[in-house]
Amino acid sequence: MRVAASLTLVLALLLAGCGSSDEGATGASASKASSSGYVDWPLFGRVPARTHYLPRQERALDPPLKQAWSINTHALIEFPPAIHDGVAYVINKYGNGKAVRLRDRKVLWELNVRPSDKGNPNFVTGPVYYRGAVYGAFLSGHLAAGDAKTGKKLWVRKLNAHLESSPLAVDGTLYLGTDTTDVLALRASDGKTRWSFNAPGAIKASPSYHDGNVFAADYESSAFALDAKTGKPVWRTNTSKVPPYGHGGFFSSPAIAFGRVYAARDDGTVFAFDEQTGKVAWSFDAGDYVYGSPAVARVPGTPPSVYIGAENGRFFAIDARTGKPRWRYDVGGPVPGTATVIGHTVYTSSFKTQETTGLDARTGKRTFHIKQAGYTPMVSDGKRLFLVGYYDLIGLEPK
């Protein structure tokens, strides 16, 4: 069990801004550049449906790539940086953060916060920007909000739970899960509770949102959809009671696209649920533990696909409609984290080999390789790519 962060560390996030907006399911409607020419990657999964996909018709961001620079954060980066209007906000596991202007690597903000226990991480979730405010959740149970421009504290709330679930913000409401089995909806302006839903098991994954519903999955085999305004259940599917599946906990966050909800249990079973009813549309056995979340994309020239890796080192492209494998690539080591799809390339990584690999989304052929690795391997501001290493944020440019 990781030691909880102190309130002092909670306030560290308030100096780190990031960006977001309410966006479509796959990301296709959210890939337009801002007036400055940048595309935002404002939260874990990039869009509220958490598809981990940045569409690009052109191949300007595809390999070959070259390393342009590297910034060391001096500790593990559990979550990728949030990117808003050309600035990346990077926070390591101890709550120490930097705000980096990506075009010239100028550090706009830098935090030097000492952990309450140097042997244990304090910050474990991804921050989110919403309507001028920055929100972040901490393992200690603290949820904090700050002004995105100034870093001034807006509010802090202590929940009686541990938090490993990254917040989500939609329509003035924050959504997150707790280890005390609750899905919470909090008023973004002051952190007060709008509603709570008690699930059968702990919520370790992050909730997702699409078309008026919040989707989550727990550690007691259940996936469910809730009305985002009221918290009332729309559907719930206990996968342990659906033959032939036994018990398995959901550690991965749901991704919503193409009328389906995609999520993986830690026993290696990848599920597709009907978005409206929760009925199991198909399942796929990855052959080993799965801890990462699925990336879902319709890349030009390919059918809608789910991309996910397992502890056995196998990485799969699965047809999102049928659950049949399109191709498989052997990474060479366990895949503990979540893939991302940028343009025509899907990126995955392995801590054991300390390698990040780029694969052609259509064929599975390797097109990129570098000796750096993190949980979520790559993000982008629409102009460049940024590799998330174990300690480093690495800027990559087309050759």
Describe the predicted segments one by one.
Residues M1-L7:
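Bacterial N-terminal signal peptides that target proteins for export
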Residues K32-Q67:
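Blade/loop signatures of beta-propeller domains
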Residues R101-R105, D147-T150, R187-G191, D227-T230, ...:
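Short loop/turn segments that connect beta-strands within beta-propeller blades
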Residues P42, A88-V90, K98, A133-G136, ...:
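Conserved beta-propeller blade signature
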